[in-house]
Each structure stands twice: as structure tokens, then as C-alpha cells.
Amino acid sequence: MGVTSLLFCGVFFLLLLFVAADTCEDIFMHNVIISEGQPFPFNCTYPPETNGAVNLTWYKTPSKSPVSNNRHLRVHQDQTWILFLPLTLEDSGIYQCVIRNAHNCYQIAVNLTVLKNHWCDSSMEGSPVNSPDVYQQILPIGKSGSLNCHLYFPESCALDSIKWYKGCEEIKAGKKYSPSGAKLLVNNVAVEDGGSYACSARLTHLGRHFTIRNYIAVNTKEVEYGRRIPNITYPKNNSIEVPLGSTLIVNCNITDTKENTNLRCWRVNNTLVDDYYKDSKRIQEGIETNVSLRDQIRYTVNITFLKVKMEDYGRPFTCHAGVSAAYIILIYPVPDFRAYLLGGLMAFLLLVVSVLFIYNSFKIDIMLWYRSAFHTAQAPDDEKLYDAYVLYPKYPRGSQGHDVDTLVLKILPEVLEKQCGYKLFIFGRDEFPGQAVASVIDENIKLCRRLMVFVAPESSSFGFLKNLSEEQIAVYNALIQHGMKVILIELEKVKDYSTMPESIQYIRQKHGAIQWDGDFTEQSQCAKTKFWKKVRYHMPPRRYPASSPVQLLGHIPCNCKAGKCNAATGLITP
């Protein structure tokens, strides 16, 4: 029973969601009365719902089938528009525009009434003022005013050949009237200028031509001067940065009283924009739109630059609204040096970081390559005879010191002396018999460029540093008297240096240490292995010339490739 109840509740909840999602909020209804035989559009807009990602569909009630999107049909939906090409008497009815987004649904209704009525037809009763689709407009007496031909169609429709009529006669340009596209300028308005006007235009859609007629009933009225000064909220005599060759649209926003009929237009060099650029049509004035407020009307007249040219820079384009005027000036954009500077700085920092990363990763190989590429066979004139003094722990007889002796007395000379051409002083191998230990060490340590110290983790292995004069004199001369660079090599990983003499602790802290990998194979005796590269990196950048008695032709270095060390001739340059 419980499962059935839960299932029923779930189905009921989903049903509620479905009904809520399918319910649309009615916004308002438009009543439109218009004559048959001409194109008619209606744009479904409900800001901000139609500004984002929405699904908009037109219907004719009571049908649930949407209006077709096929542009070749007489009645079809074109984006947010419903378009009749042309109207017929059968088109009368109620049309619904349904707007859906991710969260809401709205619908706008249009009550369309199509009447049989024709301009200047003998069957027409009365004047055009009685026409159902007439527009009411006002002209100010004693001033200049303008009439607007309302032509709002989707982008798929092209409009041209706009003509103006008073009564049934076409208006020609003269002192009284100045037709300018969708706008008719009336100079020095008088009472007799009121009456019936009309504008017509040719509409082209997918190669088909239609004629549009708008009927305008004009009243003349005297308006108090104090109330008729319009307010231009934008532009504000400002400049606009715009790149050369770009497209620009600028709106002129005007707030005016409802009874005001001031002329609203764009001018350049005291000439209407459409007249000034009538040949190229590169710059055009747009169609005026308006929004009614309580006691005012907000007008918008835009100017479109299809392609900005050099001649447009520095030239004022002025928006006029009666006695009010405001201009814009196009200026060439100033290069944003901050962006270039920031980009250059970021690139430089990235380069520095990359170079430092590469250097830290490959500095040993880079330094060894540099020494090899730019080495000299001449010995440095520093009065030194040895490249390094080797100091290593001496184990008592019977202890496990064989590996240390093998490394120091066999492998070390094999690699550094025979393969790389260095000269080492190893006490117990290079001193002359019978010499006093103190004098031997004191004399030879002065002739060395480096001090190479081997340490082991056993605390006892370096206990001799506290007692034997060799170690004491070597470390003293290296750190105090001669400022020698010390190479510290760990025979095994030393975790705790606290048991070591303070001199060794100081060397470890200042110079770091190189750890021997404990490999005594043939491959480990190659100067190109990782361990010996580190040792060579800390050794002096030199080798003895071939004529030196230290270097023998019989010395054969190794060549390490694919994990093997093969014999080769010549010396490896450190």
C-alpha cells in the first residue's frame, strides 16, 4: 500500500509539473485593423524574454498547429515576426505568439481585422482619415515639422521607392515639402497643411514585389514654446573611438512632450545625412522609433556607418530635435600600449622562467658542453699543480674499507685522470717516501684547486678528523687560508651530519653534496655517467695538454651509449 501511494504521489507531482510547464501567462492583446492587399508584419517582442535563448512560435487560434517557417508561403513566421504577403480578408482572426524559455512561458495575442478598403478608390467612402489603419500625427504651426512613414519589416524584406502623397496627389520636393526617405519634412507649417497624407513603398521579398501604403491623418497645432524644447539624453557632444573600416550604429535618444512635433534627424555639414550620402549610402539615418511614457514620448533615431573611413574622423555628426542639438565626433582609437607592455612583460617573464627551468634542469650538461666547445689546451697560470686534493676516511686494519679504497685509489684516478685529464693529489699515493706528513700536506694543499672530501655515514669513519693532522690541515687550508672550493661526496646517504666535525657540517651546508651510487661495475667507470658528470661540473674547467707528462697516449676513455661503455680514443673534455 505504501509503494502504491508513493507511486501515485510521484505521478501526480509530475503531472503538476507538466501542466505548469504547459501553462503560459497572457501578457496583453493587440487590436490591429488594416486594409487588405498589402504586406503586413507583426513582431513579437517581450523584453527581456526575447533577448536570450528562447523558443518563439506563432499560432492562429483555435488551431494548435504553428504557423509555417517556409518563407515562400504567403503567411509564414520569420524569426520573431509573422508576415503576410499580402493580406486577404480571410486573414482576420486572433493570432498568438508563444514565448518559452528555460523557466517561463508567455503568450501575446493579436486581434487582426482585415477590411476591404483602398486608397483613392472610387468605392472609398469619405477621406482617408476614416481608414481603419490610419496613423495620427501632429505638425506645429509656424515651425518646421516632419511626418514619419512607419515601415517595420524583418531583414528578409528590402524597402525602396518611398513616395509621399497629400490627398491623392504625389508630393514633389520644393519649398514646402522635402521628402527624405521614410521622413517628410514640412517647412513653415500652416493650418492648411493638415489633412490626409499617405506614404507608399515597394517591398521585395524573395524576388517578389509588393506595395505598402500607410495612411496618415495630420492635425496642425500651436504648441507653447516653453513646453516644446526636447531633451537629447544621448549623444552629449562626445567623441567615440572606432577602428577604421568598422561598422558603427549610434542612437540619438530624445525625450519630448506628446504634443510636440519637432523634427528629429541627423545632419552633417548642415545637410541631412541621407542627402549628403545619397550616392554612396555609406552612412544612413535609421527609422525613428518611440515609446510612450506618461506625459512624454521617448524617441530613438539612429545613424549607421556601414564602413568608417578616414574622412569621417574629426567631423561632427549632429542629432537635431527641434531647437536642441548634440553631436558625436569619431576619433581613431589610441593604441593600448598597456596591453602591449603587459604582453611583452608576460612574454619576457615566461622566457626568463623557461630559461631558468631549462638551465636548472640541464645546467650540468650545458656547462660541460660549453667547456668542451670552448676549451683551451693551455694550463691556467695560477701556479697550481693539482686539480684536486683528495681527502677520504682511512679505516683501521681489519675494518670494511675495501670499497672506499677501490673508489678513491682505483676508479677515481681512472675516470678523472685517465679519461678527463685531471691531476689529483691522493695522500698515500703521490707523496715521496720519507717526507714528514705535516710538511707534505701543507705544501701540496697549496698547489691544489679543489678539495675533494669523501664522507661515510658511520660516525667512527671520520673520527680521524679530530686527531689526524692530514685532515685538520687540509680542511683548515681549504676553508680559511686559500678559499678553495670543496667537493663533498657521500659514500652512502648521510642522514645526520650532527656527528660530523663542524667543518664538514659547514661544507655540507654551503656547497651541498654528491652521492655515490655504490656501483662498481664497468659502466660506473665512465666519465659520462650521471655521478661523474656532477663531479666534473664541480672540477676546474681545464685539462692538461697532450704534451704534459701526466697524459699518456695509452690512456683510453670510455664512450657510454645504450647502457654500455666502449673504448674510444682521445680525452673527454671536462
UniProtKB/Swiss-Prot annotation:
Glycans are attached at N43, N55, N111, N231, N237, N253, N269, N290, N302. Keywords: Disulfide bond, Glycoprotein, Hydrolase, Immunity, Immunoglobulin domain, Inflammatory response, Innate immunity, Membrane, NAD, Receptor, Repeat, Signal, Transmembrane, Transmembrane helix. Disruption phenotype: Complete protection from imiquimodum (IMQ)-induced skin pathology observed in wild-type mice, including hyperkeratosis, acanthosis, neutrophil recruitment, and expansion of IL-17-producing T-cells. Residues 360-574 are cytoplasmic. Disulfide bonds join C44-C97, C149-C199, C252-C319. The active site is at E470. GO terms for molecular function: cytokine receptor activity; interleukin-1, type I, activating receptor activity; NAD+ nucleosidase activity, cyclic ADP-ribose generating. SMART domains: IG, IGc2, TIR. Expressed in bone marrow-derived dendritic cells, splenic CD4(+) T-cells, bone marrow-derived macrophages and bone marrow-derived neutrophils. Its main location: membrane. This is Interleukin-1 receptor-like 2. Residues 22-338 are extracellular. It is found in: Membrane. It is an enzyme of class 3 (hydrolase). GO terms for cellular component: membrane. It catalyses: NAD(+) + H2O = ADP-D-ribose + nicotinamide + H(+). Residues 1-21 form the signal peptide. Its EC number is 3.2.2.6. PROSITE patterns: IG_LIKE, TIR. SUPFAM superfamilies: Immunoglobulin, Toll/Interleukin receptor TIR domain. Receptor for interleukin-36 (IL36A, IL36B and IL36G). After binding to interleukin-36 associates with the coreceptor IL1RAP to form the interleukin-36 receptor complex which mediates interleukin-36-dependent activation of NF-kappa-B, MAPK and other pathways. The IL-36 signaling system is thought to be present in epithelial barriers and to take part in local inflammatory response; it is similar to the IL-1 system. Seems to be involved in skin inflammatory response by induction of the IL-23/IL-17/IL-22 pathway. The chain crosses the membrane at residues 339-359.
